């Protein structure tokens, strides 16, 4: 139904277009898991340590035993790869201490806690200094709705990981524009607005699915000491040696508490282990989505096939390459980053978010059937921690047979215990690939762990059996990872994590429930958790289809395809659309009469409401998580807009009115009044002839009223276009030879557009629809919004955006109704800017100086160099100045249009001022069509 797709892409701009982004954290493998949570946090947590990778490793290893320091001295002469290698070697040297501590676990627990706290306090001091730098950075620009910064050394990496409300802004006149996608590295958390603690997740959820409010900070208490507990262990805390994995370092603190609690340790570790793992998955998933057009897909709901953004793709791909290199560098130095998945395209930052998923890909590529179990936590036994680790795994396997709770606890702890050992193998591969000089070191590590690998592989077999019993569905879910899918859905990683958590909840109610778009949970009612799991499983399975279709995920296609077939609901098609059956009843109330059409967001059906005995239109949203979340946002916005009506109950905002909403077979359904054609459909039916000026005047009043209502709620629609404006009814009359005199001069009676096909609207009442991409002003702003022909220049130039982007869209729509065709009909940025310059005149210096990509040093637009772009510029030459498109007697309308299409957002007319413009109140005497 849509004629073009809106590309919601995030691209690097002023702040981190090349090497700035996240590179500061690469020098310290000690805190790489901070990378998973928040790249910007790492930049500042590592400032005290990142003179080079050697010093970073020295920092951690100085806290190790003397034997480790000897190794440190030996390896300082090597390059970064060797340092990483030696770091893992030191970890192996600590195995004996760790094993001894494990043997005497109960007796040594207090001593280990004392030692752990000592190193923890020392690291807090360094961490605090880093956070001073970080705070000074964030405070250098205005913090909009700053989050809790009371203790960054404990809290930054989870609460501030979702820096949804930290925005760098620059004031452009009367408006404050977000530069999240350009100057603020916090934009890595782009989809946190979709999955995190912002308003986008809190919308009307309890009204739709009878769940609790979404709270993204839930269970983050377990993560308060996230980065600090990393150095708390430093591989010296023998009591916590099986938790030495970075990505669950919070378990060290929890386990210290467990030691104090004695018999309570198992249950506590169970919950904490899961919450840490899931939390990391969420945040890094969002980072990936942001840097790989995650929001692109979000906005593509509103698109079709009419336009494309090829130039945008090129622009963003370049920046993605920078991010890819960044990720490779991060993964190279991080203790737990598995680099094997970087054989794929597009720099998989998602590997950072879940080390188990990366291992899953490794096993998948080798065809090893252990891949499921390997990612099942207990099978991560490749190397390290010697024979005692095998015994420990066996001990945990026995526990897993006893109860699912113990199984979850032991799986996570085994995973933590073994992940560091896996680093030896994976980093050895890194060293072999990157530097032949490291071969000897790699061989030494392999020799140290050779026998252990064999023993651990045996344990893997045992763990596979136990895991298949207690967590069988988790095997599939870990294979259902989207590490290599960068161009599809926003929520792939969260969906995967959601699947993992859902299945764990089914087996183990104490697991933390992180990724549900409904609510967070720490157990509770079995039936309630089960419902949540089922609800999110469908969403996650839907995104699994995108993974299977991803070009970047070819080596995992077989696994993902199997998962799709096993988990895909029988009432959905392969693209997550509901398979509508004419005559069926939705929600035991609405009888389906016919299918009206389908878009990227939903399927629209016409139904008979058995309660009110009238026809309604029901939008059945696709079951994929990203579409479900957008629907929840839209529901909340529509309910708030309805409150803007006046006291007599008449709905004046001219926004579509929501009659009902419900969940039906894992699909959000929105019930509306049955409206008529969209403005675009009417223009098409009328063969793209212009509308009379009197009708444009009436539509202008209603459209500006709708925008004013939204802006009063601090809401930006972001996707105004004729397709998203519906007529209340489709009543119109056909003109034949009896055309009114004032119309004849405007109609070419000699063309193929015969006169008898001309349509004249009888009722011009309209409503604005499609609020799935609407954004509140105080929430995160993605870089690219608005459909291409209606996109304002500030978005193209990367200056940020706010309410004026809607005003520009209104101007484009009104001119299109006046002309009968799109004013800026283009598909790339260069041509788009050239069209604007041709129609509206040269850009002001405040805009031309922003981007050297599009403007030269003299402030004039750069001309294309390749033949395709040169050919595309030929269309620009056929355009006229805006004034030349307007009839001489329509000066008032021209004045309004030119003020709506003002270049500078700060000077662009507001919705409230536009409603007072003289054009909206004058009597139209010469009601002719369009331009002369």
Swiss-Prot record:
Belongs to the protein kinase superfamily. CMGC Ser/Thr protein kinase family. Residues 590-920 form the Protein kinase domain. GO terms for biological process: protein phosphorylation; regulation of RNA splicing. It catalyses: L-seryl-[protein] + ATP = O-phospho-L-seryl-[protein] + ADP + H(+); L-threonyl-[protein] + ATP = O-phospho-L-threonyl-[protein] + ADP + H(+). Its EC number is 2.7.11.1. This is Probable serine/threonine-protein kinase clkA. Residues 11-21, 39-123, 148-196, 218-305, 314-342, 351-562 have a biased composition (Low complexity). It comes from Dictyostelium discoideum.
């Amino acid at each position: 139904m849509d004629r073009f797709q809106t590309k919601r892409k995030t691209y690097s701009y002023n702040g981190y277009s090349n090497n700035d982004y996240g590179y500061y954290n690469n020098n310290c493998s000690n805190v790489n898991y901070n990378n998973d949570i928040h790249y910007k946090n790492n930049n500042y947590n590592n400032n005290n340590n990142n003179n080079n990778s050697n010093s970073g490793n020295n920092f951690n290893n100085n806290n190790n035993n003397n034997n480790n320091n000897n190794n440190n001295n030996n390896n300082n002469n090597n390059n970064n790869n060797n340092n990483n290698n030696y770091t893992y070697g030191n970890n192996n040297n600590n195995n004996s201490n760790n094993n001894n501590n494990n043997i005497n676990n109960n007796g040594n627990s207090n001593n280990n806690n004392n030692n752990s706290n000592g190193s923890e306090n020392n690291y807090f001091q360094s961490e605090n200094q880093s956070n001073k730098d970080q705070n000074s950075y964030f405070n250098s620009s205005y913090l909009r709705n700053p989050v809790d910064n009371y203790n960054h050394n404990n809290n930054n990496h989870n609460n501030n990981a979702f820096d949804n409300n930290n925005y760098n802004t620059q004031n452009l006149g009367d408006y404050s524009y977000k530069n999240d996608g350009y100057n603020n590295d916090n934009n890595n958390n782009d989809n946190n607005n979709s999955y995190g603690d912002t308003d986008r997740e809190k919308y009307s959820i309890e009204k739709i699915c009878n769940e609790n409010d979404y709270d993204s900070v839930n269970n983050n208490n377990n993560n308060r000491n996230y980065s600090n507990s990393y150095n708390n262990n430093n591989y010296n805390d023998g009591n916590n040696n099986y938790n030495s994995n970075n990505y669950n370092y919070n378990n060290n603190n929890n386990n210290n508490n467990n030691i104090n609690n004695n018999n309570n340790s198992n249950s506590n570790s169970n919950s904490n282990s899961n919450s840490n793992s899931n939390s990391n998955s969420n945040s890094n998933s969002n980072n990936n989505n942001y840097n790989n057009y995650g929001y692109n897909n979000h906005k593509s709901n509103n698109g079709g096939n009419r336009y494309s953004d090829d130039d945008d793709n090129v622009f963003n791909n370049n920046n993605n390459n920078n991010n890819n290199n960044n990720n490779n560098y991060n993964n190279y130095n991080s203790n737990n980053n598995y680099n094997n998945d970087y054989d794929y395209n597009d720099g998989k930052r998602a590997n950072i978010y879940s080390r188990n998923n990366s291992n899953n890909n490794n096993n998948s590529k080798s065809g090893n059937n252990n891949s499921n179990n390997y990612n099942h936590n207990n099978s991560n036994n490749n190397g390290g921690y010697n024979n005692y680790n095998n015994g420990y795994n066996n001990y945990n396997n026995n526990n897993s047979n006893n109860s699912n709770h113990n199984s979850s606890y032991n799986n996570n702890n085994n995973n933590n215990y073994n992940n560091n050992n896996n680093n030896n193998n994976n980093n050895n591969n890194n060293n072999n690939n990157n530097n032949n000089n490291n071969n000897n070191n790699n061989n030494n590590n392999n020799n140290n762990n050779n026998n252990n690998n064999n023993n651990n592989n045996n344990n893997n077999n045992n763990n596979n059996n136990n895991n298949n019993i207690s967590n069988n569905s988790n095997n599939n879910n870990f294979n259902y990872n989207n590490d290599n899918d960068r161009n599809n859905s926003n929520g792939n990683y969260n969906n995967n994590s959601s699947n993992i958590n859902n299945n764990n909840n089914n087996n183990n109610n104490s697991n933390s429930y992180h990724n549900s778009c409904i609510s967070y949970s720490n157990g509770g009612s079995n039936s309630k958790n089960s419902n949540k799991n089922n609800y999110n499983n469908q969403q996650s399975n839907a995104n699994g289809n995108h993974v299977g279709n991803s070009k970047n995920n070819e080596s995992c296609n077989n696994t993902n395809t199997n998962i799709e077939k096993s988990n895909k609901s029988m009432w959905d098609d392969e693209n997550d659309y509901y398979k509508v059956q004419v005559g069926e009843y939705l929600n035991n109330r609405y009888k389906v009469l016919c299918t009206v059409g389908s878009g990227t967001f939903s399927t629209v059906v016409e139904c008979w409401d058995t309660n009110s005995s009238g026809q309604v239109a029901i939008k059945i949203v696709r079951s994929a998580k990203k579409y479900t979340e957008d629907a929840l946002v839209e529901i909340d916005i529509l309910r708030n807009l309805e409150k803007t009506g006046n006291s007599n109950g008449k709905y004046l905002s001219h926004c579509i009115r929501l009659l009902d909403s419900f969940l039906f077979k894992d699909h959000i359904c929105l019930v509306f009044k049955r409206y008529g054609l969209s403005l675009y459909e009417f223009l098409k039916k009328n063969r793209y002839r212009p509308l009379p000026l009197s009708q444009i005047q009436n539509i202008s009043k209603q459209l500006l009223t709708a925008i004013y209502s939204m802006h009063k709620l601090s809401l930006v629609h972001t996707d105004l276009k004729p397709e998203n404006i519906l007529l209340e009814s489709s009543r119109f009359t056909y003109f034949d030879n009896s055309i009114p005199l004032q119309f004849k001069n405007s109609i070419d009676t000699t063309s193929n557009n015969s006169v008898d096909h001309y349509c004249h609207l009888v009722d011009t009442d309209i409503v604005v629809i499609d609020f799935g991409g609407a954004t509140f002003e105080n929430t995160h702003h993605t870089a690219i919004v608005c459909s291409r022909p209606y996109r304002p220049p500030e978005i193209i130039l990367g200056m940020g955006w706010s309410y004026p982007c809607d005003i520009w869209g209104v101007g484009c729509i009104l001119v299109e109704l006046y002309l009968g065709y799109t004013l800026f009909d283009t598909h790339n940025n260069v041509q788009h800017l050239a069209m604007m310059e041709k129609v509206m005149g040269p850009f002001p210096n405040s805009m031309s100086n922003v981007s050297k990509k599009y403007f030269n040093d003299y402030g004039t637009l750069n001309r294309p160099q390749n033949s395709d772009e040169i050919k595309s510029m030929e269309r620009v030459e056929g355009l006229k100045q805006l004034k030349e498109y307007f009839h001489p007697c329509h000066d008032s309308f021209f004045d309004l249009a030119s003020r709506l299409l003002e270049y500078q957002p700060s000077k662009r007319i507001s919705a409230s001022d536009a409603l007072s413009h003289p054009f909206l109140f004058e009597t139209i005497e010469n009601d002719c069509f369009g331009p002369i």
